[in-house]
Amino acid sequence: MERIRDPPTAIVSQVAARTQEKYQVRFAWGTGGAARIAAGAHVLVWIDVLPASPTEDARERRRALRSLAAQLPDGPEVVLGHLGNASAIAGRVTRLQAERGDRCVVAIVAAGRHHAPGDDAAEAAGEAADVPDAPDFAVEDLLAAGAVVDALAEVGIDHTSPEAAAACAAHTGLRRAVKHLVSASEAAAALGPAVVRAALAADTDLVTLRESNPRA
């Protein structure tokens, strides 16, 4: 029987870098990013600050978020993160660490913005219709992710990846301007002031989208 060769050291190093596996607090974008950084994580924080459309009501949004959580990598508990509940998330992680008697790995994933390929706005902006769908940068999700990283650091969970540290720096450096930046963002312009105000007024409670489950 032919012996299965171990992957070259260079490949192993590249995989470790892409997965941020040596860090306790990790950060990436979209479901693809979640697939990369969720290995070994105990909590996955899905950051999604603003609704997808101005007509999406609270019930539809919860249903969509829970459906999405079911598609995320098996294993970690999945909680929703936004600009108001970073402290609740940090509290959950510290409780889980106490229960485990060991550190918890936290994967923070920003949803980003998604545009329907080939729609009128995309065409007018010069975007090709055949570009694969991937999350665009969303300032509101970056700042909320940074708020979670900052809240974790406040309770001593601060072994962060460079990606997570950069998100944290964005939040702490722009803390006084967060509401203005979100209200003036690309996503906010598509939703309208009332929808954005409601999102920014979201309560501080922990929202669990999926309990932890065994990895396949």
Annotate each PLM feature.
Residues H42, P51-A116, D120-A124, A128-A134:
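Acidic/Gly/His-enriched mid-domain segments of enzyme catalytic cores or analogous surface patches
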Residues E2-G32, I37-A38, H42-V43, P54-H82, ...:
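An anion-binding catalytic pocket shared by soluble metabolic enzymes
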Residues I47:
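Active-site flanking residues adjacent to catalytic metal/cofactor-binding acidic residues
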